């Protein structure tokens, strides 16, 4: 799916990306698509939006989706961008300009937006808040803690925060970059890049454990199965929340990402050894 579409008429067919918005927790709403996520965290003083999808569908999915579930997008106060790829930063410029929302992003990714104006045409918010490790974005009594987790991009951010399920506090770990979207096919710099990724995944495993996170969210609905879980919510009744997988399974996610990265890193290390023998 293309990240940047100059002509909206050439955007992918709506049926390939549209998903219904949903109230997932008392104070957290899904306003994303079939593959890419966006989340609206409501507070007593406004809304914290996490990720903004593509330029061509952020209007319908985020603005329209929020309105559909009874939220006013004018109340967006902060927009957190997990990383500066077009499937997450796509609507940030529009939301910043229209609602005067503060945009929070990792420093290296802010630098990328400034360095490549053509790449980020229509999705280049004005440089605003540069995230730092452990920074808290707070509205009212609700806070999102930001963690620097480079790897997917140099400025990737992940988060921990608390939501409410029928009044019961539930802790969330949010992964800001899962795939190996970096130079990974040559020993240099692939081995180093994988180590950066592994270290960040270990860091988030530790943060998730420290906060006793029992929910794992991602900025891709294909990774946390958001769309299917949203359907399950409709028939939940008095049963368990489909998003609450338990602390052990949250840890397993980060173990798997580290293990996959280490396996790929080992292949590059072997490739480097074979190259030196020639």
For each feature predicted by the language model, list its residue ranges:
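Active-site environment of divalent metal-dependent phosphoester hydrolases
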Residues: 57, 84-90, 110-113, 154-157, ...
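Active-site neighborhood of phospho(di)ester-bond hydrolases with catalytic His/Asp-centered motifs
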Residues: 50-52, 77-84, 103-106, 148-151, ...
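Active-site HxH/HxHxD metal-binding segment of metal-dependent hydrolases
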Residues: 28, 57-60, 64-136, 231, ...
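Conserved beta-strand hairpin/beta-sheet module of binuclear metal-dependent hydrolase folds
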Residues: 14-69, 73, 158-181
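Metallo-beta-lactamase
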Residues: 5-8, 23-25, 71, 75, ...
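Helix-coil boundary/capping segments in enzymes
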Residues: 25, 42-43, 58, 63-69, ...
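Solvent-exposed, acidic/flexible segments
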Residues: 18, 34, 52-55, 59, ...
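Accessory terminal helices/loops
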Residues: 1-15, 166, 180-278
């Amino acid at each position: 799916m293309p990240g940047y579409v100059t002509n909206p008429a050439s955007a992918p067919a709506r049926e390939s990306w549209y998903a219904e918005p949903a109230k997932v927790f008392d104070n957290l709403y899904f306003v994303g698509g079939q593959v890419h996520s966006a989340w609206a965290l409501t507070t007593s003083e406004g809304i914290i939006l996490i990720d903004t999808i593509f330029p061509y569908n952020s209007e319908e999915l985020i603005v329209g989706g929020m309105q559909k579930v009874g939220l006013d997008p004018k109340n967006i106060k902060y927009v957190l961008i997990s990383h500066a790829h077009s499937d997450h930063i796509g609507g940030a410029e529009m939301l910043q300009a229209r609602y005067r929302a503060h945009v929070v992003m990792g420093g290296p990714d802010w630098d990328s937006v400034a360095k490549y104006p053509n790449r980020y045409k229509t999705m280049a918010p004005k440089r605003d808040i540069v995230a730092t490790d452990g920074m808290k974005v707070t509205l009212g009594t609700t806070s999102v803690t930001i963690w620097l987790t480079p790897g997917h991009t140099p400025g990737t951010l992940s988060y921990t925060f608390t939501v409410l399920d029928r009044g019961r506090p539930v802790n969330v770990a949010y992964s800001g970059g899962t795939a190996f979207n970096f130079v990974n096919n040559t020993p240099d710099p692939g081995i180093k890049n994988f180590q950066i990724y592994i270290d960040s995944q270990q860091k988030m495993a530790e943060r998730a454990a420290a906060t006793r996170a029992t929910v794992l969210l991602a900025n891709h609905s294909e990774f946390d199965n958001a769309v299917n879980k949203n359907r399950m919510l409709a028939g939940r009744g008095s049963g368990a929340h489909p998003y609450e997988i338990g602390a052990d399974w949250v840890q397993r996610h980060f173990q798997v990402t580290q293990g996959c990265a280490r396996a790929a890193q080992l292949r590059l290390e072997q490739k480097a050894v074979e190259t030196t023998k020639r």
